[in-house]
Amino acid sequence: MNIKPLADRVLILPAPAEEKTIGGIIIPDTAKEKPLKGEVVAVGHGTKDEEMVLKVGDTVLYGKYAGTELEVEGTKYLIMRQSDVLAILG
């Protein structure tokens, strides 16, 4: 399925949650923190007031409660406004 975000929205594939701590303790699914990092997989065309800075392939940081979760063909994504992205990792 092809998803094209509208206006100033971006589609992000969240990074997988950590399975183990640095000390080697396995983290159960119920205790895992929601990932705050992911890869941009699609971007909208922007608005007349906001140019799109993010590009497909950018790795970004976003807030804990940013975006709306959606699942497509078994893969979980987040869709959010570009302004909800805190930083681009380089």
UniProtKB/Swiss-Prot annotation:
The gene is groES. Belongs to the GroES chaperonin family. One of its GO terms (cellular component) is cytoplasm. Together with the chaperonin GroEL, plays an essential role in assisting protein folding. The GroEL-GroES system forms a nano-cage that allows encapsulation of the non-native substrate proteins and provides a physical environment optimized to promote and accelerate protein folding. GroES binds to the apical surface of the GroEL ring, thereby capping the opening of the GroEL channel. The keyword Cytoplasm applies. Its main location: cytoplasm. This is Co-chaperonin GroES. It is found in: Cytoplasm. Keywords: Chaperone, Cytoplasm. The keyword NAD does not apply. It comes from Bacteroides thetaiotaomicron (strain ATCC 29148 / DSM 2079 / JCM 5827 / CCUG 10774 / NCTC 10582 / VPI-5482 / E50). InterPro entries: Chaperonin_GroES, Chaperonin_GroES_sf, GroES-like_sf. Gene3D superfamilies: GroES chaperonin. NCBIfam families: PRK00364.2-2, PRK00364.2-4. GO terms for biological process: chaperone cofactor-dependent protein refolding. GO terms for molecular function: ATP binding; metal ion binding; protein folding chaperone; protein-folding chaperone binding; unfolded protein binding. Pfam families: Cpn10. Heptamer of 7 subunits arranged in a ring. Interacts with the chaperonin GroEL. It comes from the Bacteria.
